[in-house]
Amino acid sequence: MRFHGGRTRAYGDRMELRIASLTERPEMRERVLGMANSWPEFVTEDLVGNAHYARISAELPEYVLFAEDERGEIVAHAHSVPFALHAEDRGELPARGWDEVLVWAFSDLRRGVRPDTVSAISVVVDPRAQGHGLSARMLSAMRDNARAHGFSEVVAPVRPSAKHLEPHTPIEEYAHRVRPDGLPHDPWLRVHVRAGAAVHAVAPASMTVSGSLAQWRRWTGLPFDTRGDVEVPGALVPVRCEPERGCAVYVEPNVWMRHAL
């Protein structure tokens, strides 16, 4: 589950929000998809995400929520997908996390398989509105929406929001690190736990971005001319660069969290 937003505060301490789904207001789709975000460019180059993300709002609009402030500006949105976790040959949350749950969800939709679980996909907050608890409010609205559609569990392949500050820390260690009060060290994991979730497992290969060295140079502004691990701003783990093969690969780990409703 991706969480994105900057740190600039351009609003007062209290934000009055109106939250709706795209089923209720389909005319808002382009504005929702066009809302500002702070995703690192390379993150948007995941081929699975590129093939499926925009389809959520087109084919599953009841699972896309957005928030408007008192001026009618869209300040946040949340995407989720229903899927059949307990279908044959599944049953366990996938190691390929975010990518695979998107594939499962649209495969189920295409084949008419009845879903039994909702997976969070993203919560995005406009950089100007960050710092007012919107991520927690959108997560709560996503939980309520899943419950209203008859589901008893939301799962989330969570992208820890501060992991990029420690790209060499093993994800297993990071995911289970807690503060003295027992809450997770990571801010985004902490929001989920406060909402009622529990850490379930690591998704070691939740998202994969591969590209030529020229592409990685364009995406990051870094030289990508030396074999080995390259630290990229915003990346949770180093990117593996192999100049002799002319390519580099980023395999992002996430943390599976489970919300009982």
State where each predicted segment sits.
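N-terminal amphipathic/basic-hydrophobic helices that include classical n-h-c signal peptides
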Residues: 1-14
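Short amphipathic alpha-helix that is part of the acyltransferase structural core
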Residues: 11-97
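Short hydrophobic/aromatic beta-strand element in the GNAT-like acyltransferase core
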Residues: 62-66, 77, 117, 122, ...
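Conserved acyl-donor/pantetheine-binding loop and adjacent beta-alpha core of acyl/acetyltransferases
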Residues: 79-122, 160-185, 203-247
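Conserved acetyl-CoA-binding loop-helix of GNAT-fold acetyltransferases
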Residues: 125, 131-148, 153-156
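ATP phosphate-binding glycine-rich loop and adjacent ATP-lid/helix-beta elements
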Residues: 189
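Conserved acetyl-CoA-binding loop of GNAT-fold acetyltransferases
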Residues: 193-201
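Short beta-strand-to-coil "C-cap" segments at the C-terminal boundary of structured domains/repeats
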Residues: 258-261
